[in-house]
């Protein structure tokens, strides 16, 4: 197994800044904007985006937290985890929602998130913001806002480390098939 640091803390902060600027540019009137972080790492990213957008535009958008455990179609592959509670700041009917996640790969997480959102109202529009797009989609789902497109192989893993969840800041590319020569 090999690990390569793709982004360090400073570069990661730059990606988040770029996402915040793009979202802020598209939503100058924040009254209808709700950022919704997909658990786990999408939640701290949503709060960071809120803080940056508030700095840029003077008003913080609303933030929600979405747990998709029971909406996944791949529960048997990774085992059942204990679900968390979804928390929404308001009814999403008529709102402009930006779903936030750390990495998009096959599109299954986002598909589940879209299904879970139906329980919180009918948004006017739903967009997707991701830190890393690594390709290899199985569903026709594409991010509207993307920090970086990273070329990967399907057997590789992209792992985002955030201080809120991992006590450090970086992005790793992990290749489980690589052999270390001795």
UniProtKB/Swiss-Prot annotation:
GO terms for biological process: regulation of DNA-templated transcription. A motif (PRPP-binding) lies at residues 97-109. Keywords: Glycosyltransferase, Transcription, Transcription regulation, Transferase. SUPFAM superfamilies: PRTase-like (SSF53271). One of its GO terms (molecular function) is uracil phosphoribosyltransferase activity. It comes from the Bacteria. Disulfide bonds: none annotated. It catalyses: UMP + diphosphate = 5-phospho-alpha-D-ribose 1-diphosphate + uracil. InterPro entries: PRibTrfase_dom (IPR000836), PRTase-like (IPR029057), PyrR (IPR023050), PyrR_bifunctional (IPR050137). Its EC number is 2.4.2.9. Regulates the transcription of the pyrimidine nucleotide (pyr) operon in response to exogenous pyrimidines. Also displays a weak uracil phosphoribosyltransferase activity which is not physiologically significant. Belongs to the purine/pyrimidine phosphoribosyltransferase family. PyrR subfamily. This is Bifunctional protein PyrR. The gene is pyrR.
